[in-house]
Every structure is written in structure tokens, then in C-alpha cells.
């Protein structure tokens, strides 16, 4: 989209198990998608637990071992950007054409166990560049002394899609139970990482003192039934609303009193950037890695997984004067420009060349 040499840059996406299938209509027609397998195995692979994910991981590794070697040696790309399931292409670099340079894109806070440390260290010479989404992750990788420091860069995720935002922000929030209601919003997968149990406990603790507020949780996940039972047990079901997955979170943010991120960890925390884009007041856990880098002094950070501190920061937010809130929003909105697609593209080009 942003390249001045569109005819010279050929971009190809490798689809190993059907992971790109649902995004086909969103991908530029000039970008080729190469499917390693006809069947979309992603629909059948076990997930939602560590053991199940390891089984899926091994299956994907074995299924695509020779296919990926054949493809890379046939195509001979200048660069191969590897992301999420990184061990297969990194291991196969032993068999790749030496022309192809591997760029390791670290996404999310990596668990640097013994195996991963050994693996990355062993293959470090085969990796051309490494990108990290946050300064904290960058420092973590540097301190482990796995790669040559000159190979490692901070590359912010391309979270902000301006065209999409401008379109979605025009949509009205036509939800009857939220009409004329003041509400706090939480957004994310309903998983242990997002820590929505803390959010529900927080709301129970403040609801008598601040009866004007409702709590809206947006997302789906394996903890949905647990959270629903918790809401009923605490007798707050009339004021807590689990809305499920929503294609447009902006209309919720734009109509909320504040956004709360309760996560145990992030890297960097996409929804914080989306909230800042909508000028929403932000209260976030001071979890690793990312929220503190984004918010700095322009929001309200509470101690990770600390209920009392969350309540304190919420009350501090309520007492903060509107002119101070506005000033914080303006400063934060300027900072998140580094999370646009254009900024990501320019930085990536600098890193590659």
C-alpha cells in the first residue's frame, strides 16, 4: 500500500493450515497467498490448553516440514518474515537457499524457557534481523544475550487502520440496555490472561457507592461460562453485560465513561491503542510488557492484579478534572501515531535495508 516501488516488491503470504482463509477478502489482490495444504486444518486442531496447543504445534511442524523447504528453495525470496510459530522456518533455515534472509518477528511477551533460549541461540547466526513490539521486550532479549545487539530492533505493531476507524466511528451504539447508561468497558478474549475476574470483583466492590455505572465486557473465550456464573453469584447480572465478540469496538469505547485493561500480561496491548484513538479515558494494569510504555503519565496505572489499587485508581480518575483528562488524551493520541500502518511500514523498510 505504501511502497513507491509496487511493481518491484512481490509480497507472498504462506498459509500453512488455513490461517489466512478468513482474511482473504481483506488482503490486497496483489498479494499472493500460497497454501501449503488444501485442507484448512486450523478448523480441526485442538486448542485452548497448553497440552492441546503443543499437540497442534507438533502436527503443524511435521505436516509442513518438507513442503516449506521445497517452497522457499523454489521461490528464493530475499526475505522471510517468521511470526508466532517460528521454530519450523528457523530450523529449516539449515536447508534454505542462502539468499533468503530470515527476520524473526517476536510478538507478545515470549516465555524464554530453556528450549527456546537454546534454540534461538543455536540458530542465531541464521537470523538476519529480530523485531520486538515493545522496548521492554527489546531489553529482555538484549539482556539474555541471545543475538547480536545490532540485529535487534523495536518495531511497533500496525494497530491503527485509519480508514477502518473513520468508517466504524460513525456507527451508532443501538443497544437498548445501554441506552442513556453510563458504562465502563473491558475488551479482550475471555481468558486467564485478560483477568476479567478481577474486573468483575472490582465492579462488585464499587457498584453500591457508584450505582450509576454499568460494566460492559466485549469478547469470547473459554472463561465465558465461569465469568457468567461469577456475575450471577455476586448478584450483579443486571448491571454487567457480556456482549460477546464485536466487529466494531470503537462505538463502545466512544460511548463509555472509561476503558479498563485488567490483563496479567500484554505486549503491547492493542486495545489501549484503540481506546487512545477514540479519546477514551484509560485505566490499566501495570503489567508486562506494553501498557506502561503506551500510557506513561497520560492514564491511570494500577498494580498488576491488585483489586484495591484498581478501585483507588478508578476513584482517582473520577476526581480528576476534565481539563487534565483532556490534556492527557491529546498527549496520548500524539504518542500512538507510532502504531499506525504507515509508521510500521517505514520502520520495517529501515530495518530490512
Q: Where do the protein language model's features map onto the residues?
A:
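Short hydrophobic beta-strand element within catalytic cores of glycosyltransferases
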Residues: 281-285
